Regions:
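Domain-level signature for soluble enzymes in the chorismate/prephenate branch of the shikimate pathway
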Residues: 1-91
Length: 91
């Protein structure tokens, strides 16, 4: 983590992190596509127990890395919902 002294430096670091996040989300999307092709039925796309399992794992990681749960949980729930929509589209 870089100690920033100006808003320009802060913005540069946020932009760098955003680029990394996009790269990771693109990688995640590839696995969502694979899941859409592997699952045998459309009803298998939404798996509520799995959703809750993922959210719990994320919240554990959020705690470990001092990421606010108020940010982590809604962001991941939205990510999961959008991933499900995408998975339905490629199913």
């Amino acid at each position: 983590m870089v100690k920033c002294n100006t808003m320009t430096e802060v913005r540069m670091e946020v932009d760098r992190i955003d680029r990394e996040l996009v790269k990771l989300l693109a990688e995640r999307q590839v696995y969502i596509e694979q899941a859409g092709h592997i699952k045998g039925e459309r009803t298998a796309v939404r798996d509520q127990p799995r959703i809750e399992e993922v959210v719990e794992k994320v919240l554990h990681e959020a705690d470990r890395h001092k990421l606010s749960r108020a940010i982590a949980e809604p962001v991941w729930r939205l990510l999961i919902e959008k991933s499900i929509e995408y998975e339905y589209a490629v199913f």
